[in-house]
Design a protein with these regions (language model features):
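N-terminal lobe/hinge region of extracytoplasmic solute-binding protein
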Residues: 92-154, 185, 266
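Surface-exposed binding/hinge segments that line
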Residues: 84-86, 162, 199-250, 606, ...
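Aromatic- and charge-enriched surface segment that lines or borders ligand/interaction sites
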Residues: 148-193, 210, 216, 316-319, ...
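Detector for C-terminal structural segments
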Residues: 29, 95, 275-281, 285, ...
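Ligand-site clamp/hinge motif
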Residues: 164, 259, 289-341, 480, ...
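Extracellular/periplasmic solute-recognition and catalytic clefts
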Residues: 187, 194, 206-209, 274-284, ...
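Gly/Pro-rich hinge or "lid" segments in bacterial periplasmic/extracellular proteins
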Residues: 117-118, 123-126, 134-141, 235-299, ...
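Alpha-helical secondary-structure segments
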Residues: 90-95, 176-183, 212-218, 222, ...
Length: 639
């Protein structure tokens, strides 16, 4: 499959000639272009942000439209002149795999607090936006940036924060505590319509300013993890502080944060946006960046960041082969290995397969609405779980690149808790594929098979409509076949992420999705199963990944106590609560975890070295994460 799949990419390239020109393809020597990528001429009209529902966890609920509108707007003629930058000083990247497009959208809207606007995770996080703190999730090390330090009080409901002195916005105005307070107040005032606004309104009582560099965040209740999760995890917590002196004069819900003549969008990062079109976003390095002026750190070596759209992983694979792409979407394992065979400059986080990729703290999960008929029965949910062959999905869909999981715990620091739960995991043995036990569960629940071999009760079949977004499509046909073999009337249906997300939030479908959260501790994932994140039938659920609508007062009480605790595998009470949560999850099986996401994140060393990997894990490698800004600063020109 693999070499053929790469060859098939050529069939797709003709419609994307403009894109190929943008990244500097050359018929004479495609691997060594010397000119900066060409830039298309600007157009005239602005495009509004696409409507979307609030998404309190960016990774878990992608509100993307994979088909760009026909009418795209480019930068007005008043935009800054774009200088020439050679290819070997330009870092070329694309969006993540949920951003497969032939053209960028929202090209004149950089209000990253509005749902549906994804610039903050696909481009702005690479160089324009800086966050208070980052975390190297490989070892848990905190990396202070525009924030210098923070400290909780003894009751864990107040955080004193110190900002770094000398930080400036790209227009030269100092970055201060007033910007932070303004941002927090703005987001809460616009709850629930802004990203993260529900979580902030629920947890943040107030922000008090001491002076320009000191402020305090007061919480409504103790939560020792809230600050770092919101302002310093380096994951998908895209909580960009906005410039008060600009935003206080605007309506935050309609402000597009874009005016080339005024230098908008402002950022404190080492790069500024100089052009935005349907074909490319261009960010050029600011040699007057505050980090150099204050002696904090050196300028990053890339002089330009070029963000281009790409149609799918076939096209991305061909661009990687031609050295026209430095990083961007992950490739399927086979596609990556075929591409690497043709270009030895390509690498991933791990130096060898089959698990080339790094963990992203998320699992693939089959979500069933626990309020719907059939799925409201724990025996039915367990029967479906026993029908799933996780090893087969891992091996056939992902060639062993996505390891099976049975508990809502992924990688990084949280894995230290798994040995403390192993006896419970062994007791339930949820990862076993056993059709006989599956059938026994269904019979216990009062079901019998009809003449076609499907499970029925009261004359009604158990129908499972497996709606799966495009980036998870490889597992669809396999899972469909497994469930059918177990007597469930299952149908795989590939759909658009935004449409599936809407239906999932309303509880209208069964979905294979992703659940994220378990980066540091069990609580960060189990909290999704709190009843407060559910909703009555027919209403939209409140939690980012609570599509299962699981409600259990026992689980609620456990999670309420864990919320106010500092996690530690050495804290006997915390460990006991985590074990109780794991036991309830495995007993009730509210959703079915299938495999751990370990994407083959591609890094091209032809023009740039210094990428993170197992040999130097200074940052997690995922392009959509805030921490990718640290990678931009670590890259070195290869030639």
């Amino acid at each position: 499959m693999n070499p053929l799949k790469i060859r098939k990419a050529f069939l797709f390239l003709l419609p994307f000639v403009v894109m190929a020109i943008l990244v500097g393809c050359s018929s004479d020597d495609p691997a060594e272009p010397t000119e900066a990528p060409a830039v298309s001429e600007p157009a005239k009209e602005a495009e509004p942000v696409k409507e979307a529902k609030e998404d309190d966890h960016d990774h878990a609920d992608h509100d993307e439209d994979d088909h760009a509108d026909d009418d795209h707007a480019d930068v007005p003629a008043s935009a800054k002149e774009v200088k020439d930058v050679p290819r070997n000083r330009t870092l070329v990247f694309t969006g993540w795999s949920d951003y497969y497009k032939t053209q960028h959208d929202n090209v004149e809207n950089f209000n990253s607090w509005l749902p549906g606007n994804q610039h903050s995770r696909h481009a702005m996080n690479k160089g324009l936006t800086e966050y208070l703190f980052y975390t190297n999730l490989n070892n848990g090390e905190l990396v202070p940036w525009i924030g210098e330090s923070f400290e909780y009080n003894d009751t864990m409901d107040s955080i004193d924060v110190v900002l770094r002195d000398g930080v400036e916005w790209s227009d030269g105005v100092p970055f201060t505590a007033h910007d932070v307070k303004f941002t927090v107040d703005m987001v809460i005032a616009n709850s629930p319509d802004m990203n993260r606004s529900s979580a902030w309104a629920d947890m943040i009582k107030s922000v008090e300013i001491t002076d320009d560099l000191h402020f305090t965040i007061n919480l409504n209740r103790p939560d020792p993890r809230f600050f770092i999760n919101q302002f310093g995890l380096g994951h998908e917590n895209h909580t960009a502080i906005v410039a008060k002196h600009v935003w206080e004069n605007e309506d935050a819900m309609t402000f597009n944060n874009y005016d080339p003549e005024k230098g908008w969008p402002l950022g404190t990062g080492a790069y500024e946006l100089v052009r935005s079109t349907a074909e490319a976003q261009i960010y050029d390095r600011r040699d007057d960046w505050w980090g150099v002026e204050t002696g904090f750190t050196d300028l990053p070596e890339p002089e330009r960041l070029l963000f281009i759209p790409v149609a799918d992983d076939d096209v991305a694979g061909q661009l990687y082969i031609a050295n026209d792409l430095d990083y961007g979407p992950p490739l399927l394992k086979g596609t990556f290995e075929a591409a690497k065979a043709r270009n030895d400059s390509l690498r991933s986080f791990n130096s060898e397969g089959p698990e080339w990729g790094a963990a992203d703290g998320c699992n693939f999960v089959l979500i069933m609405n626990n309020q719907k008929k059939h799925f409201d029965n724990v025996d039915v949910r367990w029967a479906i779980n026993l029908a799933v062959n996780r090893d087969e999905i891992s091996n056939l869909a992902y060639e062993g690149g996505m390891p099976p999981v049975e508990l809502p715990i992924s990688s990084y620091g949280v894995k230290q808790y798994l040995p403390l739960m192993q006896d419970i995991i062994d007791k339930y043995d949820a990862g076993t594929h056993d059709l006989a036990k599956s059938a026994a569960r269904m019979e216990t629940a009062g079901y019998s098979k009809d003449s076609a071999g499907y499970w029925t009760k009261d004359g009604e079949k158990v129908v499972i409509t497996l709606e799966i977004p495009s980036w998870m499509r490889p597992q669809g046909p396999i899972l469909e076949k497994q469930l059918q073999a177990a007597g469930f009337d299952a149908v795989f249906k590939q759909g658009e992420p935004a449409t599936i997300g809407d239906r999932l939030q309303m509880g209208e479908t069964e979905v294979v999705w992703v659940q994220c959260g378990s980066i540091n501790e069990p609580y960060d994932t189990f909290k999704s199963y709190h009843s407060k994140n559910s909703a009555p039938p027919g209403e939209t659920y409140k939690g980012a990944v609570q599509g299962g609508r699981y409600e259990n007062p026992e689980m609620d009480a456990i999670l309420d106590e864990m919320e106010g605790m500092i996690h530690s595998p050495n804290d006997a009470r915390y460990v006991e609560l985590a074990r109780q949560a794991a036991e309830l999850y495995l007993r009730d099986m509210p959703v079915i975890h299938i495999a751990e996401e370990k994407h083959v994140v591609v890094q091209n060393e032809h023009y740039w070295t210094g990428w993170p990997g197992v040999e130097d894990p200074y940052a997690a490698p995922y392009p959509p994460w805030n921490g990718h800004y640290l990678i931009t600063h670590n890259l070195k020109a290869a030639k």
